[in-house]
């Protein structure tokens, strides 16, 4: 056989192998039966016999690609039958052998192939020779195979199937192996092959390079993104920006477009679409656009300028506030290097800012279009509102950037328009101040209605600016970006869009038309506010949205307003807040609108008008107090009186009715639309909370008051306050009014939570008849909210958890802002509890401190930090709220725990931790406890938010938390008493908290994002707490990356960083930061 083999490998070998294989073929038949065994035998035998003879065979197999090829060619020379038979069986056996010998052969082949290829590359026959003696033959053939393989490869690629049978079997197996290995090694082989430049290699190489290049290019984009991502922000930007912005922008598009107007959508989406892909481009574009928008807006000057400057500035402002220069730089850079620079330069700040900015810019671009379009739309939407709307929208554009700012813009736009130079300065970053000042002034002047909205918004915006930044950034980053910033609605809409968008748009539409300014304002405010104030709420709404995206938008919108007030309240807002609070009412109407679009208008109209008047009454917020007042009429009354509740009551009554109707109706409607409520939970919780929820809750809870509460809720604070009002409602209301909005949202959120435990809430309510009423109502609300809220809230929670960071960031923001609402918003998920808590806390936090002056004193920091009259006001509310919040919180805790089992669990931790935390609280515990307390109730997010909330809460929540222990009972039983206890405890706790108060503040701000940001931003202050909290928050933060977004205005800048982080990076970023 060997002779035959030697004489003619092809013929002899063919025959002999044929024979041999025939022999094995019988075993092969058997083999088919005895597959393994026979194969092995055959393989062994075949391999072995072929080893000598098959050396050629094997040689053929490994190196014999050549030999075999030649052989086959020669075989081809042989009779076709022999060849066929041979090939068939040979292939079979070879395949079998190969399969058996695959590894060795493959290895050999691989070696050969690699070497072959290498040889091919190098053309080293020696290498081949080294591979096998056979290869010497194959050596020439190696070269030949080089050609043939090339041909074969080519053929193979072409003839994969046909020729591939044997050619492939050998070649393929070899080459396939090679290829696979090359495929795996494709890099090496590609490289190697690239070296050889074989057609295959080239093709492959080219193909791969092309593919890779594209991917690489894409990847480069991605990589850049990723690379940027290494920068965190870039990644976040890219991911966030791309996904987020895309999502957000798109979300914005959906939500915003929906909300803002298809213009927005169209404009925005384009940008959006670009933004994701282009995010950088979009960022640039957005940035450029933003700049252009600035320019363009500048042309709109009034709006765009105002807006844009604000937008730009807002971002700048916000960012400027946070990262003034970075904003600017980022802005420019954003323009140029949006992706890289954005991420790179400030990456975090920048990125976020940029993101925010980009989004802002993008938003601006969109807004630009939107602003124009929206202005148009806004204008169209509401002729009169339109301007504000437009401005607002324009602002909203900025608002989108920082809708909060948008709010400012609305106001600022107006103000800015008034103070356009300032606006320009705004651009300079003074704008922030100016904006704020303007916001303040504007708030004062705008405050009337616009002022109210604007103020609120401005305040919000203003607050938001930071908030926005946070909100925006947060929004941007968080989604809030989209949601809050983009428009809490828009984004939220996106999320809300999911629900919100429609709703948001409704708010927008409803609001837009009626409230359009509010809508925009609200949107901007809401959105803006939401972003900031609501941001947590709104954001929360987003979380809520998550929970009830749609809701979120409403929340944003609604809450935004309310929340915005919160935010504003929170920020400058405190002062503005009152207007905002009131405004929130007005704005709330939007929320109402949101909640009850139709209603909203009424509410808006009534409320808005009324509210606006209330605005003056501003503390029409009192109105909220009214709610509280209503809620806790007598009780609240004092607060109302404080707030002007009397007035408010009427307005509340009216508003209440109106608002309540609106809110209530809205809430009832919308709320009733628990679906909306569901949304509402979000919305309600946020908006509702802010308004409906709270309102509902408060109203419902309080009085059915639901309606009234709505107003109250509107001043959910009231509601929350309700409890507080109930407890110290009167007191709370005023603060509530101011804080109310803030609280409001929280309350609302709370509502959800309360909602969660209507009973509990009731117990809370029980605690105070009013409260009980509230609770009652709340239960309705809660029920409503609970139903939805619970689900939503839960969803929210989930979403929050998912979005948590966003939400949380909001909270942070808010919290930071002092709008615990935000935290609440964040909590929103937990929000309800948190919100309530937070808000209440904010109230508590602010108010509580005030309420519990001791804490307030500490809180003052928070409060100061929060910079909330709210604090002051809230303190009253807070005091009550504190108590109520405690209740609520407890409720929340209960509810939240219920709603958020996590929270619940957490609450326990909070409770447990709470004391524990309390120790820390002394150190940082307030915060920690805060988180724990509230967090426990709320959730981790809550924790985080709670950190914030709790922080605030600690003031009241702390007490609450302490009640937490009671809270556990509370949890067990709403423990109406507990709330009371809490109240009492609150005093105590507050004292303890008091120390934390400061921490609190940071914690509030510190809210996850805040923490991080705070950490950075306030790091000094918060450093310890931030750190601690951050850690705890980090989880929460990560969970609630939103928290990052939430980063208070202060934190804003940082938050921006966080923001980028916040969403995706939020966690990552946080991690990174952490």
UniProtKB/Swiss-Prot annotation:
List the transmembrane segments.
none
Q: Which residues carry this modification: Phosphoserine?
A: 25, 57, 186, 275, 365, 1020
Q: In which tissues is it expressed?
A: Expression is restricted to testis and epididymis, expressed by spermatozoa.
Q: Which InterPro entries match?
A: FSCB (IPR043375)
Subcellular localization is given as: Cell projection, Cilium, Flagellum
Where are the annotated segments for Disordered?
1-73, 272-294, 317-343, 437-789, 818-982, 1026-1054
Instruction: Provide one Gene Ontology cellular component.
Output: sperm principal piece
Source species, domain of life:
Eukaryota
Please give one Gene Ontology molecular function term for this protein: calcium ion binding
Q: How is it modified after translation?
A: Phosphorylated by PKA upon spermatozoa capacitation conditions.
Write out the biased-composition intervals (Pro residues): 528-544, 576-592, 673-688
Provide this UniProt record's keywords sorted from A to Z: Calcium, Cell projection, Cilium, Flagellum, Phosphoprotein
Q: Where is the composition biased (Low complexity)?
A: 274-290, 448-467, 558-575, 689-720
Question: What is one Gene Ontology biological process annotated in the Swiss-Prot or TrEMBL record?
Answer: negative regulation of protein sumoylation
Job of this protein: May be involved in the later stages of fibrous sheath biogenesis and spermatozoa capacitation. Inhibits ROPN1 and ROPN1L SUMOylation. Binds calcium.
Query: Quaternary state and partners of this protein?
Result: Interacts with CABYR. Interacts with ROPN1 and ROPN1L; the interaction increases upon spermatozoa capacitation conditions.
What PANTHER family does the record point to?
A: FIBROUS SHEATH CABYR-BINDING PROTEIN
The name on file for this protein is Fibrous sheath CABYR-binding protein
Q: What is the lineage of its organism?
A: Eukaryota, Metazoa, Chordata, Craniata, Vertebrata
